[in-house]
Every structure is written in C-alpha cells, then in structure tokens.
A protein has these predicted regions:
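C-terminal helical subdomain
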Residues: 105, 182, 202-239, 246-248, ...
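Active-site loop immediately N-terminal to the catalytic Tyr-X3-Lys motif
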Residues: 101, 147-153, 175, 216, ...
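Substrate-binding pocket helix/loop in short-chain dehydrogenase/reductase
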Residues: 99-100, 104-112, 209
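Conserved glycine-rich cofactor-binding loop
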Residues: 8, 15-17
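Alpha-helical segment proximal to the catalytic Tyr-Lys
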Residues: 128, 171-175, 237
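Active-site helix of classical SDR
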Residues: 123, 158, 166
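Residue(s) in the substrate-gating loop at a strand-loop-helix junction
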Residues: 142
Length: 276
C-alpha cells in the first residue's frame, strides 16, 4: 500500500470509468480528491459519496472541456476546495471510431479540444500550485498511441499527442520541481460499455474478453487507479516524461490477422503462426 495521506488530488473525468477508479484509489490511500465531470453528475456524486462515507474528503465539480474558460474555473475552484494541489490527473477524454472519410470538422475539433487542448490548459492553470507542492502531473493516454486500430484515426492522433505532450512538458517543468508522467491503459471494460446490449451477461462478457489478452484477464478501473497512485508516489520519483503502458500485454503481441497470415503460411509452411 502506498500512503497518500494529506495529498490533494484533482482527477478530471472522474464521474465514471477509469477516472472514477483513479479517484477512488487515491481516496483509499488517504488523499483528498476533487472529482470532475462534464455531464455525469450522478456518477460524480456517487464517487464523492463513496469517498465521504469512508471518511475521506471529496467534492464534485462540473466543467465543459470543449471550452478553455471552464477549465480555468475548475482549476481555481478545485484548488480552493483542496487547499492546494499535489497531483493532477488529466484523465478526461472522449473516444470516437469513425471512417476516416466520414469524420467531420466538428468531430475532429471536439476530440482535439477535449483530449489535447484541455489537458494542456488544465496543466497550465495549476502549475503555480504544483510548483509550491513539488507535485505531479499524470496524463492518461491510451495504447492507441502506440498501435493502430481501424477507424480510430482521429482518436489515436489525440492519444499520441498526449504522449508527446507528456514528454515535452516533463522537460519544461522538471527544473521547477514538478514531475510529469503518462499512463496508457489498454482496454478496460466497464458496465457502461455494454449499455447498447441489453440483457447481456456483463461479467461473462468481460471474462471472455479477458481471454484475448496475454494476462488472461481484463484490467479494472482499480488496477489503473493503483498504478496512478504509484506514479504519483515518491517510489516513482525517477520516472520523468515516460508513459507507462498498462494493458495486460496487449501491445507486446505482433498480430497480422488472417489476411496476412495466408501468404506467410504459404511461404514458411503450416507451422508458421505470426505473433506466437
């Protein structure tokens, strides 16, 4: 267990999913947490209630990350509530899988506004507070920054931008005592991912999905939360500018798919199985 007692943490996009798991884990380890949401007030309130009921300190804040002004307001309000800031987790983001030629300018701009511009200006807004505490910025990216996936061109571009942003911001802020790191989760299925499939056995679906991952199981929001807590701790003080991949081994595989496997089999024989 890593002690976070007395630490003050802001986790963006923490009303549901990974962000919620990160916020709850920081709270379990003793941190006071500012929970942010853009439209999931119910989830954010539930996160806060769970923390407060366990004896912790938390409050929910709403901010639309499509604009910069609400980001700056969130920074001020969260820091005022917490009494300072030790850790910023830039987790808020949106995804989109859409054919390249059907992506609109509005969709493109929205993804980059929320996934790239928002973390940039959120970090900028809290630098004075993090400089006082010699704090940490954790940018949540994705394995889409490192591996291609069909119809994810825009989304993957935003995740790659976060990895590069993390590396460069780390160099800018290290002399001021602020450590910047990244965390790139693989697929972490949560119940909300299955809302378009009523009647499905969610636990079974998650178990089946886990069989496709080298680890043999799918990660959970708490898994990602525990890694985030580690990255924010003194134990990770020598990790600067790097983005840690946490995906159960997904990106270690070399997979060509059946269409590529056929000519490779013809060339090397039936015993050749790409990626094994």
């Amino acid at each position: 267990m890593i002690e976070m007692k007395g630490k003050r943490v802001l986790v963006t996009g923490s009303g549901t999913g990974l962000g919620q798991g990160i916020a709850l884990e920081f709270a379990r380890q003793g941190a006071a947490v500012a929970v942010h949401h853009s439209h999931s007030a119910t989830g954010a309130d539930a996160t806060v209630k769970q923390i407060v009921d366990a004896g912790g300190k938390a409050a929910a804040f709403k901010a639309d990350f499509c604009e910069v002004a609400p980001i700056q307001t969130l920074a001020r309000e969260a820091v005022a509530f917490l009494g300072g800031l030790d850790v910023l987790v830039n987790n808020a983001g949106i995804t989109m899988n859409r054919p390249f030629e059907k992506t609109t300018v509005e969709q493109f701009d929205t993804l980059y506004a929320v996934n790239v511009r928002a973390p940039y200006f959120m970090s900028q807004a809290v630098v004075p507070d993090l400089e006082k505490s010699k704090g940490v910025i954790i940018n949540i990216a994705s394995i889409h920054a490192f591996r291609a996936f069909i119809e994810h061109t825009v989304y993957a571009g935003t995740r790659g931008a976060i990895v590069t942003f993390t590396r460069n911001l780390a160099i800018d802020l290290a002399p001021r005592g602020i450590r910047v790191v990244g965390l790139a989760p693989g697929a972490v299925p949560v119940p909300s991912h299955f809302k378009s499939s009523p009647g499905i056995d969610i636990e079974k679906a998650i178990r089946e999905f886990g069989k496709s991952i080298p680890s043999g199981f799918a990660g959970t929001p708490r898994d990602i939360g525990e890694i985030a807590v580690f990255l924010a701790s003194p134990a990770a003080r020598y990790i600067v500018g790097q983005t840690l991949v946490a995906d159960g081994g997904t990106t270690t595989l070399m997979h060509f798919g059946e269409d590529f496997k056929q000519p490779m089999t013809a060339q090397f024989g039936q015993g050749y199985v790409p990626g094994v």
